[in-house]
Amino acid sequence: MGVCADLGSHRWCRALSTQHNTEKSKEQQQQSQPLEIPEQRASKCRGDIDRTTTTTIPASKTLTASPAKTAAFTVKTTRRRRSRRRAEGSSICVPIRRGQGSTPTPTIQVLQFVLVSLLALLAKNAQAHNIPEDAVHITAILGEGVIFNCHVEFPNDHPVPYVLQWDKKVSETGSDLPIYIWYESYPEHIEEGYKGRVSRVSQDSPFGSASLNLTNIRESDQGWYECKVVFLNRDPKQHKNGTWFHLDVHAPPRFSVTPEDIIYVNLGDSIILNCQADGTPTPEILWYKDANPVDPSPTVGIFNDGTELRISTIRHEDIGEYTCIARNGEGQVSHTARVIIAGGAVIMVPPTNQTKLEGEKVIFSCEAKAMPGNVTVRWYREGSPVREVAALETRVTIRKDGSLIINPIKPDDSGQYLCEVTNGIGDPQSASAYLSVEYPAKVTFTPTVQYLPFRLAGVVQCYIKSSPQLQYVTWTKDKRLLEPYQMKDIVVMANGSLLFTRVNEEHQGQYACTPYNAQGTAGASGVMDVLVRKPPAFTVEPETLYQRKVGDSVEMHCDALEAEGTERPTIKWQRQEGEQLTESQRNRIKISGGNITIENLRREDFGYYQCVVSNEVATLMAVTQLVIEGTQPHAPYNITGKATESSITLQWLPGYSGGSEYKQDYTIWFREAGVNDWQTISVTPSGSTQVTINGLASGTTYEFQVVGRNVLGDGMMSKVMTVRTLEDAPAAPRNVKAATQPPDSFFQLMPDEAGPKPGPPRNVSVTEVSNGFLITWQSPLERAHIVKFYTIKYRTDAQWKTLNRGQIRPEETQYLVKNLVGGRTYYFRVLANSEKSYESSDEVKFPVPARVKHKAITAGVVGGILFFIVAIILSVCAVKICNKRKRRKQEKEFNMVACRITDARNIAANNHHLHNRSTGSISSGQVPLKNNTEHYRDYESVFIVPGHPVIIKIVQTNPNIKSNRHSHCHLHWIWPPDRCTNCHSIYSSPNLEDGDEDDGGGGRRRSVSRIQRSLDGRFVLDVEGVSKLGYSQQTLESGNVDVVDGGLFERRNSNVSQKSSSDDGGFLSRRNFITARASWRRPLVASSSQLSLQSAADSARGFLQGLLKIGAKQSAVPPNSQSYFDEAVSGARYQNVLRPYTSSNNLYGNADRSRPLHINTISGSLSQQQQLYTPSRISRIFSSSPQQLQPHHQQLLLSSGGSGAYPTHFSDLSTVYPPNSAERSSHNLSSRYRYYSQELPSLRTIQEETRRQQQQKQHPLEDHFVPLQLPSPPSWRSYYQSQASYRPRTRWYPRHHSRLFSNRQQQHEMLSPLPQLNLNLRNSMNPGGLEASPESRSSSSGFGSKNTSNHPGSTSEWRLLPPYRAPPSPPKHSGYFGGQQAQGQTPHGSYSYPRATTPPYTMAHWLEMISRLNAATDSNLPKAPCPVDVGSVDGHYEFDPATPTPSASSMLREDLNLHIDTHPYHHHTLGPLSGSLLHSHAPYGGGARKQRSLPAHLPRYDNVEVRLQAMREEFYAYRKRQAMQQMESVC
């Protein structure tokens, strides 16, 4: 008999061994096997049975049942490899024979049987206990899914048909329940309870082909599972694949038993709260009360593994919400139960303090619970039901939950609101909150009139109501802002009123106040008239002290008188500090007017009394003291106490003792607070005011009173004083637990039993408001009465910090924070602190949003823009100032070396750049002028020969015209006929005769030697030469003829307009009612110069010589005339030497008397000449030293003739010697003025000796020659056509015109059309243009013609001139000479007056010359006196010395004669200027030489003081204009 065990299939099989029929067969079988030792055979059998191998299989992968659910499980597999014996039969253990033919003994058989039985039992136990050890353990969550991974191992790796079966072990007996069976091509078998939850995994999944998917796991699914794979058509003994799995199902906790949601209890009852939960693993039970863990105490405990919470003897602090929490590794659940006291309502959510704006809605909550739940809620405001408050009746609402709503709120709604709840059982419960209504500050009342007492302190009231509190008040007085903070005698009070410390009359006025608070203002008050009046005055004042005995009477007197204009004051008596008289006193008091009488005095009558006098102006007060003697002592006062642990020291001030003869002692009354019995202690020594009471308990509050006593008895008791003794020094702490605090902990280590803790603050929140962040919370529900203060902790990192600096009172439940940093996250906690403990609220997280300070950015941007604008403005101003200073410096240097170039320079400089008249362009005339030669294309070519004098040439271009019918029209360039009242005689001229020499054109030409210079630089014509012109000496003496610059003109009743359109300064000199400015304003004409000058030296002599030739008869030229002319110009200093005339005739040799006089101009009326030499500055004339004149140049100059000379600058004269032009070129010294100023300054002080030498060379015949100093001469312009189209007169240049043009293009655009002007003299007629009027340049003494400041290009003002207003035209006269004019005859040399074609005629030059020549003492004096220098206002303003100063007091000079020497043998003198006629010394045509003597020494100036005064006034006016200009330029 044998037993075999198939360990590979884990099945035990029993084989029954058969006995051979014959002994022979047994013996043969034994013989066929080798002999073995019994022990070895037994060992081999046991080894086959017990040989096992244990192998650890790697953990399987985590499987997922579905995408939505994941089964996380742990695989713990121990696979034991068993040794399998592959044999046809079972392994048989046979008895061992010891010898051949011997049989086993009974003992051996018994041993074998026992051994086999034991092995069978062990194998059976091994089968039962090996399954769990080899299983794969999987953990899954309840309700989720799991996959059992099972692989199929085919025999020899060849797929064969198989059956898949999954079994679940349902009992310890080993019975299996097939839950899933699968065979290919057959329907699946699923056990009941697993349908819809089990399935075979897909073949393309990463799991084994035999894997099973189990979903929606239940707790019953926990257990053992086996995967079986049975291969068909195989030997049953073939091994089978299979795996064991153990499934553990975990479940989150869930309650199986919970307490009721609301539990009603009575105080003193006991309750048990039961809370049980199921789950895998077993959950843990925790208890919380109002979000805080329940602390075990003698009355509160947790039992039965935390499932029960027992509360015995319920108190008020035990009422609240209790929460049971069950938790395990899979989650947690909670349940809350409310414990409410039955029988009375309890407020669960009390109201909180609120602050609202006016007009908003406010809600006060008041939630209450009670048993039974019929809770009634009532609301009160300041003790009155809100339903009964009339102001709230229509705006208040009470909800069912007890909340109070007020909508909208008003300022008067501020106050305390109380919520009271009750259900009829017990006392009502109440809670209160305060409502603060904020609104802008406003004025509630505005008195019409307020009075201030004169010379006393007074107050101007502003009745203000404000919430929040008032911040400031602004005041206005008489509609102007009042700054009381800047005044010493005005103080702004806390309520916004004005306190005047000493009133004066200046404080009277109309006042208004405007209050402001955090919400702004509601507006200003009305206007209050504040009147200053005298206050009432005391006429009788009470005495300072009244002493009376008990029972006596006292009479106190008081009276006052009102001030004038005020009401009579009222007088009343009162006790000190405004206390009214007591009832007992009123029966004993008599008041008569201002007198008061108190009878039957008592001790209580002792004290201070006030006499109050008041009216509408002021309230005055007089104080007196009434002392009652013979009474008990009065009560001590000002009691103070100092406490220790066991003693208190008291101090006080004694009261009135009852009289000086009474001595008082003191007794201390004290008791412990809350105790009814008082104890007394006498104070020793007698009269002491300090005592120490010992033997008191520590930490106890005591009450004290002090009473005085004298011989009359005990006095009055003092006020009660409360003092608390100090606590004993604390002993060393015991039972202190040492703990390591985390770095973020803000809690302090406290010993055990530190005292009761208050409940934690609730509902902590952080909200952002307009002015910061508001942290709010609610007071604790438990032990809120022990809260002493709150503390707020915060952190942004690990360290907790205290937010509030001081303690927050327990009634406050909010805190405003203003300095939180944007972009950070803050954590807050609120601590409720008691005396010895505290409790913390939950941590609140608040991220502060990152804020951009838009206002700061805007302010920065605006500030930056403003900064750049200011910088630009300052830079421009600095550049302008620097440029202006630089120009002034340059001009100052320029004026140091250059004479003031006036008329001729401006003429030449301006005409140099002129195009022909048709283009209408002009030159700016700036200094220096630009080089431009193209403008001379209309001129004849000239030679520029440096170092030679320049010949002045005045050409008569049309000598063939002999008719003088229109010849007088050409004199209109002197003065326009419509500018004077009676100018007809001005434009009439006699037939001037000159037989000195022939001009080559059939006419006669006078010698230059007839012209001499007077003391002031004017030219004088010899009278003898005048007589040859057809005027008699009587005519000249009678004043009917004017001799002006070599021309004689008859005038009759001329009334020249004295008006000038210029307003920029200057002075006028009056001569015989003919008014001329110091620098004469030319008539308002807009024509170019009519005179072209070809010299920079004393070229005016040629001009005068030309004037003498006007109208002269043609005659032979005297042999000495050219020499005179040469002498006149030989000493001249020049710069540009022009090409000689192409004609070899003399200067006026080609002039025809019958044709109009042709005057060279720059405007282009002459034929164009080829220009042989053009320097870099062709239009400049440099002042340079004369150099040797080449002979051929001199020959060319002397033989020049014709009419194409290159135009030169008449004003480029200077006595200063700059470097020679042959040596180097210097800066142009041309005048910087657009219009000349008619006068050249006298420069005799410079190079006087050189000038004298030049004059000697120029006058070899000893004739006196005054240096050239005359107004700018007139000039003519030749026109292309003889008839002129008259153009309107316009003033087309401002006073600073020259600076406005910097190039030719601008000049062409700015040019105005010039009027065509005609010039008719006696025997010539030539259409010519008129020189531009110098409207903006008078004398340099005028403030508008500043020497150095008004440089071209500077920022001087642009003064637009008024339009020209033409005066009435002069009347025509019927006759010019005696009866000839009356008879309608035109004498020889007279003018017809064609009004339609009469151009303007600049007579300003002639009138000014006459006025200046009259100031000279004698034209024949050998040496002219030096000009008087009036001086200058400052370094920039100079005055022409040759200009007399007019004044209202200055008499017109009528005794001055105009004496002109035109020839050594002919002298012409103009008599005194009287009336409108000029008188001649010789009759017309007379040849006798007759000279009128002049006074020897006449003053150069009429009235210097008046002139200086006028100069000062105009200087001040100029300074004012200059300041205005600078201000405008800066702005």
Swiss-Prot record:
Residues 19-44, 1248-1269, 1318-1395 are annotated as: Disordered. This is Protein turtle. Residues 1-858 are extracellular. The lineage of its organism: Eukaryota, Metazoa, Ecdysozoa, Arthropoda, Hexapoda. It is found in: Membrane. The chain crosses the membrane at residues 859-879. Interacts with bdl. Exclusively expressed in the central nervous system. SUPFAM superfamilies: Fibronectin type III, Immunoglobulin. Essential protein that plays a role in the establishment of coordinated motor control. In the developing eye, involved in axonal targeting of the R7 photoreceptor. Residues 632-728, 760-851 form the Fibronectin type-III domain. Its main location: membrane. The gene is tutl.
